[in-house]
Swiss-Prot record:
Molecular function as annotated in GO: xenobiotic transmembrane transporter activity
InterPro entries per record: AcrB_DN_DC_subdom (IPR027463), Acrflvin-R (IPR001036), Multidrug-R_MdtC (IPR023931)
Native source organism of the sequence: Escherichia coli O6:H1 (strain CFT073 / ATCC 700928 / UPEC)
Origin organism lineage: Bacteria, Pseudomonadati, Pseudomonadota, Gammaproteobacteria, Enterobacterales
Protein name stated in the entry: Multidrug resistance protein MdtC
Subcellular location: Cell inner membrane
Amino acid sequence: MKFFALFIYRPVATILLSVAITLCGILGFRMLPVAPLPQVDFPVIMVSASLPGASPETMASSVATPLERSLGRIAGVSEMTSSSSLGSTRIILQFDFDRDINGAARDVQAAINAAQSLLPSGMPSRPTYRKANPSDAPIMILTLTSDTYSQGELYDFASTQLAPTISQIDGVGDVDVGGSSLPAVRVGLNPQALFNQGVSLDDVRTAISNANVRKPQGALEDGTHRWQIQTNDELKTAAEYQPLIIHYNNGGAVRLGDVATVTDSVQDVRNAGMTNAKPAILLMIRKLPEANIIQTVDSIRARLPELQSTIPAAIDLQIAQDRSPTIRASLEEVEQTLIISVALVILVVFLFLRSGRATIIPAVAVPVSLIGTFAAMYLCGFSLNNLSLMALTIATGFVVDDAIVVLENIARHLEAGMKPLQAALQGTREVGFTVLSMSLSLVAVFLPLLLMGGLPGRLLREFAVTLSVAIGISLLVSLTLTPMMCGWMLKASKPREQKRLRGFGRMLVALQQGYGKSLKWVLNHTRLVGAVLLGTIALNIWLYISIPKTFFPEQDTGVLMGGIQADQSISFQAMRGKLQDFMKIIRDDPAVDNVTGFTGGSRVNSGMMFITLKPRGERSETAQQIIDRLRKKLAKEPGANLFLMAVQDIRVGGRQANASYQYTLLSDDLAALREWEPKIRKKLATLPELADVNSDQEDNGAEMNLIYDRDTMARLGIDVQAANSLLNNAFGQRQISTIYQPMNQYKVVMEVDPRYTQDISALEKMFVINNEGKAIPLSYFAKWQPANAPLSVNHQGLSAASTISFNLPTGKSLSDASAAIDRAMTQLGVPSTVRGSFAGTAQVFQETMNSQVILIIAAIATVYIVLGILYESYVHPLTILSTLPSAGVGALLALELFNAPFSLIALIGIMLLIGIVKKNAIMMVDFALEAQRHGNLTPQEAIFQACLLRFRPIMMTTLAALFGALPLVLSGGDGSELRQPLGITIVGGLVMSQLLTLYTTPVVYLFFDRLRLRFSRKPKQAVTE
């Protein structure tokens, strides 16, 4: 009592305390960063290595495997995957959540250094690493276009001037420049001219390499002067290389221009980028795992004017894609929802209390509690994101509950004629323990969430802490500010005020009277109610088992990402045509705003596209509906497939896949993997629960297999190294020299001119100069035959791996898909040498599924323990917890009704319901126990009186929580797919629990009371327990 009196009789101190809480919250709000979701990115590091011309199998065995063995020893690596393709290897290291990325980067560098001696000596550079996840969608894409400059020159500007500057911006993890390659001098050899002049490809390579050198020449010096020696030892342009003498034939000079076409071109001609049908260079910017996307994008935008000033006016620099507008729009929608929820909750209070003065009290208490929470969020390092703002929206109903319970009880004493200050003190004393019980037991629900590990635990932690802090501040405000305001602001109702909203008052009285009559009947038919309660428990189990489940609601972020997978033997020219065709189909869709894409590099038969949709207000379809519409049009394109998926704020794993979910096959037997992967993929493609089934295993690339006759080679004076060098010189885009410029270094690239490599007969024109100086055709000592070869070799850990990716058709859930895949694997009878498991997001979903029931049970157990401690009873907590089955049934039925799967967001709703619906029972049980202890009433009389007496606050708190969640259900616009499942779960659970618990709780209370009396050794003390 002294605690309450301290604040009631010291209004100035109480007001200043509330002002201090509010001011701290305002300061915290201004400093909070903005993000789509809590920081849940795994620390990921990508290691890249290249060996131009090497086959995927060579890259896997000679580059990937040594690196994997060294990198696999690093502490904290949760997953290591690699992909080796023509001339390149990429290894993705995913670390545990608690691993510091900078420390991990140092360990990665040390591991690369340790493996260096095991790597091939011909690698042009050491392996490098980046602190970014290549599977993440870029947070921003910049494009460079020009009608004047070539693609190589644009790429040079992008990679030399723009990319390094952008990489230095806080939060930027990686800037990937695509669409072309650096400028280079290309030497296209004419094999017939070489043969006629008796010049080998090695002769050309050696001559060029020796003619372009950069070595120190020293200096001359006398007694008074010093002269630096400078020579014209470097050749920089094609015009300078063309007259280079490479050989003498019968005394005549053979110049490079006589046997080759020399051009100023690019390092790799098999690269193409486009934006809206126009050739472009793309700068794909990805953030660091721990970076804030909004802050990073804002920092990049702030630097754009400076960047534009560094490039010529004839180059157009544009933002082709920006992830931040939809994130900002989504957060604005949540903020509007929060404001609406506060307004609706205050309206509920006004309708019930029918007093403007009384309504002002919760209208002050709610903002103080919510605003004060921002200070704690800032101190905890949280952000303003969809989940934390949804927590505050839901908290609106919770924080007003405490104020309502105190306010309603004080108002009841005022209506009985008690003086305001006395009513405030007496009313607060009566319900102080009730409010404490409700708040502590509600916070207890979230304790298991705080202890939950992995991605779900990290994702839900901000939600749980934010809500718990809001409840804690609300508890403080409801026991300090609320009774003080009641004591000093409220007064006995006047007749004129009692007439306000008389219709609603009469309706409430009628409801209470009707409830009293129905409750009498129920208390005389307790077995029927008990059967209903048991039925709801059984129905809960059945609904939970049968309801479709997924990990996280499918978001509409306004951005689509597409992966092109073409025939494995397709040429680059044909692949570029496919990219253009797909981009035209996409660009013609009315919901599409911008399209960028690129193809080429080490995987000629693949490409990527990034599609920006129009804002939600300018289109009627969701991202998934647009994908479904485009899928039908894209299927008509022969020889290639474009797989589209909506970019999500949460993506797990480092695999670059063409669909949202992955299933990985592992085996130590590569032959078994290659045998079973096509069978499994074809089977999964027939399942109606899956869409866009594709695989990263590509074993049917066209290959020309050359078989050396070693005996003939020995007789002719030719070794294998010379023969392999011939092939690399002719067909490997071999980088044979370096041109040094002030801003960058460029390569001289040699190959047989593409005009002479249009078919297999090109091999017949190749020759080697033997040790006697004679030109020996390749056909003299080698035979060739067409064969199939892999376009890529993939590993997970140290095992061969193949990843099957898939999307979900409309109306299907991830639980449907995972169950269908498990059935298919069983039906196929896959041998034990081939192991299958879900990867990425699908893997996290499986882990979350296994822990959901345990999490719910842990929350219930925690609440039971807290209530048991508070009530010093084993029985009363069970009475209070008997309200939960009806809430569960209501929530699951509502999800089924709205065709929404059970996701992590719905799980949050279930956890919240555990805290919400027990409040009704707490209010009933508290007053019933008080009536038994001090009113000398029988248990049935006590619980009956408690139900009637608490009917109004129960209705008020339930309607406040319901109206607080209702805007989430009705909200549209950006981010609504996250908000609606939470609102649906809470509203459905509240409606059902309100209908049932008003009757089941009294029955359970009496049941446990009789049970306790039956087993008690001291029946006389049963009432005083």
